[in-house]
Curated annotation (Swiss-Prot):
Signal sequence residues: 1-25
Assembly and binders: Homotetramer.
Domain of life: Bacteria
One term of GO molecular function: metal ion binding
Annotated catalytic residues: 69 (nucleophile), 71 (proton donor)
Keywords for this protein: Hydrolase, Magnesium, Metal-binding, Periplasm, Signal
Listed name of the protein: Class B acid phosphatase
Lineage, broadest ranks: Bacteria, Pseudomonadati, Pseudomonadota, Gammaproteobacteria, Enterobacterales
């Protein structure tokens, strides 16, 4: 009888262990929560457009003035800003107020900036159309600058149509780009930041969002499409 009891106990223990192992195997892991079709299909209500669609929308329209922001719009320039922060203010953003940083950034550090592919396509489009292209940046003005030459070289802009970069600067409480967009009669403005889109909206012109790369040093990332503006697909690079 004792042997029968031990056998039954062993069988029960084995069943319990098997059931527990089976239950553990079938339970979702916190590291692998999985997903479902509804989650995969979920999309933000954003007005996505392609470069081809932008080009089509301009068919039949005469040449016009168009504007581009620079950092995170036409250039992935985080390497220079990363270097500047480490050199001048590792624990804060004070380097952005340091004229010495801007002298470096505007006079050589863009050699480490990567031209964005979406910018190549857009600039080529507007050159084909005969549009006047202006670069309007929030960077601080410096006594000399090589940014204009870098952009002309990177995007194959002929010297005859290359306009010098406009350094609007960053003025607290102001959107410093508005006056320049107005002064140059810009009809389309491309930018990655909320300020870029807000400047265009202030003047009633077409503001088109270019996505800021997720590894940009400029954080937090903006909410593309938050103003109902057009957002270019695959424009993070």
């Amino acid at each position: 009888m004792r042997k029968v009891s031990l056998a039954l106990s062993a069988a029960c223990l084995l069943f319990t262990l098997n059931y527990t192992a089976s239950a553990l195997a079938s339970s979702p892991s916190p590291l692998n929560p999985g997903t479902n079709v509804a989650k995969l299909a979920e999309q933000a209500p954003v007005h996505w457009v392609s470069v081809a669609q932008i080009e089509k929308s301009l068919t039949g329209r005469p040449p016009m003035a168009v504007g581009f922001d620079i950092d995170d719009t036409v250039l992935f320039s985080s390497p220079g800003f990363w270097r500047g922060k480490k050199m001048y203010s590792p624990d804060s953003e004070e380097y952005l107020k340091n004229p010495a940083f801007w002298e470096k950034m505007n006079n050589g550090w863009d050699e480490f900036s990567i031209p964005k592919e979406v910018a190549r396509q857009l600039i080529a489009l507007h050159l084909r159309r005969g549009d006047s292209i202006f670069f309007v940046t929030g960077r601080s003005q410096t006594s000399n600058e090589r940014v204009s030459k870098t952009l002309a070289d990177d995007f194959l802009i002929p010297a005859t149509v290359m306009n010098p970069v406009i350094f609007a600067g960053d003025k607290p409480g102001q959107n410093s780009k508005i006056q320049w967009l107005q002064a140059k009669n810009i009809r389309i403005f491309y930018g990655d930041s909320d300020n870029d889109i807000a400047a265009a909206r202030e003047l009633g012109i077409r503001g088109i969002r270019i996505l800021r790369a997720s590894n940009s040093t400029y954080k937090p990332l903006p909410q593309a499409g938050a103003f109902g503006e057009e957002v270019i697909v695959n424009s993070e690079y």
